[in-house]
């Protein structure tokens, strides 16, 4: 299998054409005709991850966060130069899929969590189109028990919480990554909790004034889910050597 074949698989699975994204989805650096030796899957194409990909002898790095974003300067200098230099020195083809991997209803960063935790009556959630997140219901429990359940799933303690809602909860909305502003939409949808990755100062007041729980588990932790699931998917799609590269990024 070559990189072009892999791109066909990924495009058919993730449908990037449906999304107006913040950066290019698909092959960002490399040659589409390269024969695949080993695929490394990760959250972000930072220098540490690129070095890990080189060390494990991968020649394809597939990530959620690539190295090109809208509004970047055209010049290739500084950190961007260093990353591209190591990619090319290691003969690594870089592939990235951003919003399509958030939104996928089976292996995405949001829907997979809801399915794994047994939420029911699942519906798309979020103000963007297509929607990136998911909402659902679950058996009523104490909010602190719900937080513990999520912490165990994400394998990290909650980084920020604003408990503005009721003591017992039975519904939630989830958008991974930097979606704290969607708390207002969560209230509009009448769920008990809103879960995301990042947090910022307004979230505290909004949670209490809207009478909803706000829970943030970190951008990285909430966006490992999709890449891990994608790695497993590719193993079943004919790729013999696929690894997930973890990171110790707590943000």
UniProtKB/Swiss-Prot annotation:
Pfam families: DUF34_NIF3
Signal sequence region: none
Cellular compartments per GO CC: cytoplasm
InterPro entries in UniProt: DUF34/NIF3, DUF34/NIF3_sf
Subunit description: Homohexamer.
UniProt: a divalent metal cation 1 binding residues: 64, 102, 223
Highest taxon listed in the record's lineage: Bacteria
Name the record gives this protein: GTP cyclohydrolase 1 type 2 homolog
Annotated keywords: Metal-binding
Molecular function as annotated in GO: metal ion binding
Family the entry assigns: Belongs to the GTP cyclohydrolase I type 2/NIF3 family.
Residues annotated for a divalent metal cation 2 binding in this entry: 65, 219, 223
